[in-house]
């Protein structure tokens, strides 16, 4: 089933996108900082969410990992 139609899979993809963008921005900020607008600006926005809301994102990742490993 596609991640678009399954809510838990959609949340997993969004969390992975946020975590990946924040990690890439910590290694090479110039890659994401040059595209703040437009379609590629989504990755910059995900990186900002990952940086500013990192405790909440970390808690969501732990909860999602627990639910994937033990509930499904």
Swiss-Prot record:
Parts of the chain that traverse the membrane: 54-71
Topological domains on the Extracellular side lie at 27-53
Q: Which residues are glycosylated?
A: 35
Q: Which UniProt key words apply to this protein? A: Glycoprotein, Golgi apparatus, Membrane, Signal, Transmembrane, Transmembrane helix
The way this protein sits in the membrane is described as:
Single-pass type I membrane protein
Give the UniProt subcellular location, in the record's own words.
Golgi apparatus membrane
Q: Which residues lie on this side of the membrane: Cytoplasmic?
A: 72
Looking up Pfam families in the UniProt record yields: DUF1242
InterPro entries in the record: KISH_domain, Ksh1
| GO CC terms in record | Golgi membrane
Q: Where is the signal peptide?
A: 1-26
Q: Name one GO biological process term.
A: constitutive secretory pathway
Assigned protein family? Belongs to the KISH family.
Biological function = Involved in the early part of the secretory pathway.
- Name of the protein described by the UniProt record: Protein kish-A
Q: Which organism is it from?
A: Mus musculus
- Primary gene name: Tmem167a
